[in-house]
Swiss-Prot record:
ATP binds at residues 129-180. Binds 2 magnesium or manganese ions per subunit. The lineage of its organism: Bacteria, Pseudomonadati, Pseudomonadota, Gammaproteobacteria, Thiotrichales. Keywords: ATP-binding, Cell shape, Cell wall biogenesis/degradation, Cytoplasm, Ligase, Magnesium, Manganese, Metal-binding, Nucleotide-binding, Peptidoglycan synthesis. It comes from Francisella philomiragia subsp. philomiragia (strain ATCC 25017 / CCUG 19701 / FSC 153 / O#319-036). Its cofactor is Mg(2+); Mn(2+). It catalyses: 2 D-alanine + ATP = D-alanyl-D-alanine + ADP + phosphate + H(+). This is D-alanine--D-alanine ligase. Its EC number is 6.3.2.4. Residues 103-293 form the ATP-grasp domain. It comes from the Bacteria.
């Protein structure tokens, strides 16, 4: 039986390029170790379409993060070329990439998520949500240009920094434990509790290697079931497919708040999704294989 040809898409031109390169290398190494006919392709290539047509893969493993991998453009391209790919469809990627659109859908379905809105008139909008608040780009990931703002005096600088990355949203700050749940289609994995290096799980906390991760999270059986059910419902409501990750805050009252859904999570051996799977005895190679097997067009 002829082996499937796999192209791992990584890199790209988003601010998360370096993270994507690490994810792509980890996935490619895993596939090669498992005997797959796999090659890597940097999505920043101006000849991306030509190279994809030349390689003519059976499947593409999307290891892109940020705009290039999560805004639906790459998924749309692969779907038009008839190439099966990991992750969500173009429509779902468009929704999950925009945190405000995602949040509005979740709120419509009465899912627990902090109140938020676009930050257009900074003073008026901030007055409607009591401090502290989170200020961040509506699109993007890795907590780039995300700020905890405690006063009007801090708001201007946060807005200026976040607005470099597109539209800005302001969100009620929720204090509690940071919990995340990885999903691959119908498989909902163990929750992970993150103790960030800094006050919250910002870019430095994510990639400094100094944050502490608890996998499994240590939630009681009832709360573990609750957070998994919430994660799967959010995943389904936003039309996610394949591998995705749902991030929560778990407050001191015992309530979960959905913060965002990531349609193309990190895929190094130290990333959150592999930790979530590892907590259930699934090693990195097996996790990569399970994601690849769910590839669709």
């Amino acid at each position: 039986m002829q082996k499937e040809k796999i192209v791992v898409l990584y890199g790209g031109d988003s601010p998360e390029r370096e993270v994507s390169l690490k994810s792509g290398k980890a996935v490619l190494d895993s596939l090669l170790n498992q005997g797959y006919d796999a090659v890597g392709l940097d999505a920043s290539s101006k000849d991306l379409v030509v190279k994809l047509l030349e390689l003519n893969p059976d499947k593409c493993f999307i290891a892109l993060h940020g705009e290039d991998g999560e805004n639906g453009r790459v998924a749309a391209l692969l779907e038009l070329l008839g190439i099966k790919h990991t992750g969500s469809t173009m429509k779902s990627c468009v929704v999950t990439m925009d945190k405000m659109i995602s949040k509005e859908i979740l709120m419509h379905h009465r899912m627990p998520t902090p109140m938020a809105k676009f930050l257009t008139d900074r003073l008026v909008e901030a007055d409607e949500i009591s401090f502290p608040v989170a200020v961040k780009p509506s699109s993007g990931g890795s907590s780039i240009a995300t700020f905890k703002v405690k006063s009007l005096e801090e708001l201007e600088n946060a807005y200026q920094q976040a607005s470099k990355h597109g539209e800005v949203m302001i969100e009620q700050w929720v204090t509690g434990k940071e919990i995340t749940v990885a999903i691959v289609n119908n498989d909902v994995y163990s929750s992970v509790w993150i103790e960030p290096l800094n006050e919250f799980y910002d870019y430095e906390s994510k990639y400094s290697g100094k944050s502490i991760y608890h996998a499994p999270s240590g939630l009681c059986e009832q709360k573990e079931l609750e957070v998994r059910q919430l994660a799967k419902k959010a995943y389904d409501l936003l039309g996610c497919k394949g591998h995705a990750r749902v991030d929560f805050i778990y407050d001191d009252k015992g309530d979960f708040y959905i913060m965002e859904i990531n349609s193309s999570p990190g895929m190094t051996e130290n990333s959150l999704s592999p930790k979530s799977a590892a907590a259930e005895g699934i090693d990195f190679d097996s996790f990569v294989k399970s994601i690849l097997e769910q590839a669709q067009c």
